[in-house]
Amino acid sequence: MGLFNRSAGAQVTVAPAVVRPRQTVTATVTTDKPVDKVTAATLEWGYTNFYRYRWAGRADSTAVEMNDAWWLLGEVGTDAGSEKDTEDWVGVTKVDLPIATGEFTGATSSFTVPSWAPGSSDALARWSARLSVERGGRDIDTRGDFNVVISADNLHVSDEPQRRVGGDGETELEIILPSLVFRAGQPITGTIVLTPQKDMSDAELGVYWGYATLSHPLEKTPAAAGGYKSGDRLKLGKGIPLRYGAPVSVPFTLSLPADAPPTGSAVHSTLIWFVEASMLYAKWTQGIEKVRRQIVVVNA
């Protein structure tokens, strides 16, 4: 908990523990005994934003362009020695808590989660109510956490263009999905259509899910690639004939983890999901074709 671990007999409990944007939570602050010599007590609602930044040198134009383009994330290696994971507190609202004759004995405070709230996850944000008590002795700093879950109603969903991230397009790959929104723990289903622009060698086809975090800190230098994670590549077929004028449709089903972090945007970073299809030609000189299509993942 870093700085916020000096509880000194004070506890913060938030209920309900799981909430959606636009719903209200209440923090209850209790103390083992009255806290004396108090000059001020506050409770601040907000979230801790997790992100990466570049601590050495400056990000060049290529790195900045890559960070701005979600379809490039994970494609280019970065200098890991010059980038670090970090976190910053983003306060939303702060309230003064009552103190009487220099003593603090506890309080309650309610908070309505904003409509724009990013969902809780280890990849993006941790929501909390933070207690700070200033006193003549040792100050008290502690927190109570709660989880914000996200449904499709909480997000603006737009159909972003599919992007080619590898190959020359000798065979066009199109990822067709029944929906752009998928829920954590449920499968991602779809079809990949292969359309050769001329006769090509047979192909091996695979698909996987992935998510990336775009780094855009207010003050620090953005990391070149933010963060990136992908699922196992699902092999869909080998020896698939690629002949001009004969498109091939290949269905797929991917398992989405139950703890998949929801799509979201915070002050210092943004989390974006996608499905990527990759195809290898039997003749290695013909290379590889890769495309990505952005999706939205929710967990409520």
Where are the predicted features?
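C-terminal beta-sandwich interaction modules and adjacent acidic
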Residues: 1-300
